[in-house]
Amino acid sequence: MMSLLLIPVTFITVAYFYQNKGMTDKKKIATFFEITKVCVQHKGELQYPIFIKEVEDDISINYVYKLPLGIPSQLIKKLAEVLEEGLYKPVKISFQQRELYIRVFKQQIPERWNWSKDLLKEHTWNVMIGKALDKHIYHDFEKTPHMCVSGMTRFGKTVFLKNIMTSLILQQPQHVKFHIIDLKEGLEFSPYKDLSQVVEVAENPEQALEMLVRVREKMVNQIEIMKKSYFNNIVDTSIKERCFIIVDEGANLCPTQGLPKKQRDLLYICQEMLSEIARIGGGLGFRLIFCTQYPTADTLPRQIKQNSDAKLGFRLPTAVASQVALDESGLEELPSLPGRALFKTDRTEEIQVPYLKDKDMWDLLKQYKVVKQHEASNPQTESKANRDFIHFE
């Protein structure tokens, strides 16, 4: 009868490898299997993974093993972290049927790297997110329209937002429009309000509400246009314009109990409108990027989180906060490096976000500066926008 032998504590493996620094990675892995009992016992005999081959490329060596019958997938998934401790190198593990692939990387994720125009994918909505161990990570806003961004202050959230804004403008200068809610009193994004692609920048909750009323009116109009053409998703139409609603520091829209009722009501309406964009805006060409410093059930509304299939998390202080941001722990374990993050879609990747200086951003975008007439909100937009809900009939 087969029985699974349990993995002992990691530090035993680390101590052993420390005493045997001259060993090759291949020998260390074989020894690791023995020390940690990554094996099955069958008829009194221990059966370990059998080495098949190794394949080397520029950035890694892939060790391929044949797994003995009976090792469960849960055990294999735990190997990467323990192997990294023993090899002192980044490791990725995958398995298919009974073959185990242990990919050992030669270098770590860079601690810092700079954004460049070479990263652009012209005439697409596919933008650079960051660099992982083995590849550049891009995100296609046509496939996944909404994104939540979380992380402590000074760890790269606003730099990331500016990266996205710069890439989208340079890739789609004629078709991208931005509605930006900068709740740091406009400190970060008001310098860009005169770009032709920036419709408006709201600097406080009152201005945010006025902006969202106008965005809602645009959504209502888009619904009418698409209903007449019998379309329900903008990617199936010839409409090229996409509207990005960026919220920098969404916690300032949280209707906390200590505020006056009028202010709480205003903030609640803002959150409801943003939730509505997240629910139905994707198919209409509206993309929400919602950013908050410390995610909680109040500061990251449930509808926004559930409808944002792309989630980017920079370092957070606790596993609880990481669970709120990504539905998994890990952000609390990231190194204290600005720009280091976890990006989650159908899988989770550790990445380093490229760095873009404000001066370099302006040098790239100043060609799109135009003379604008900044006006107060237009009360005529209230007719359709003030309905309680937007819905398809």
Name each region found by the language model.
Residues 68-113:
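Interdomain "pre-motor" coupling segment immediately N-terminal to P-loop NTPase/helicase cores
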Residues 38-62, 242:
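Short edge beta-strands and adjacent turn/loop segments
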Residues 31-34, 376-389:
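N-terminal, intrinsically disordered, polar/charged segments of Gram-positive cell-envelope systems
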Residues 227-236:
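Short, glycine/acidic-rich hinge or "gate" loops at secondary-structure transitions
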